[in-house]
């Protein structure tokens, strides 16, 4: 029995998650020979795979191939490309593609908004990041843990500790399940502001919430002590 497109998509997705790129490409190239024509989902998985590898040239080549085959990219496709551009520091291209997506009548998802907000913060464009966050809410999207983490990180890196803590408290009030990244991000902000004691208070709170510190947690605290010149405590 021949494998159908759905089966191939599942296989490609599984291989991609394991980082087996050569096998992903081999399966993709085999599909037409086996009578399984790649679908929009197939192309989106492939594009996402290449973007995560930093191979934007191949990702956009597949995007163009899709269009030539009259397969219309969907929100998942755009999300992969925008995230890929953002991760590779190509924020202007990411914003242009976002605008192109809107002009074509596609509605962005929360992943796209969060990715762009993260990119804007990393550019140092805090005002634009908050403006996009407001737009996200107006479009009916609720901030999830990932979005909050991005804002806390962006504010913390800009020295806006009080604002970052306010968002942290807001997450508590909304009953969101804070994760290790949430705590690590705020700890990093406190350590950067030379407030290691506050970072350790967060460590205690983190463990009371049933979250175990990870390598990133300890690296953050050690770096905090080193920055203070307290090498003996580190």
Ranges and model annotations:
Residues 4-9, 13, 24, 39-44, ...:
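Pentatricopeptide repeat
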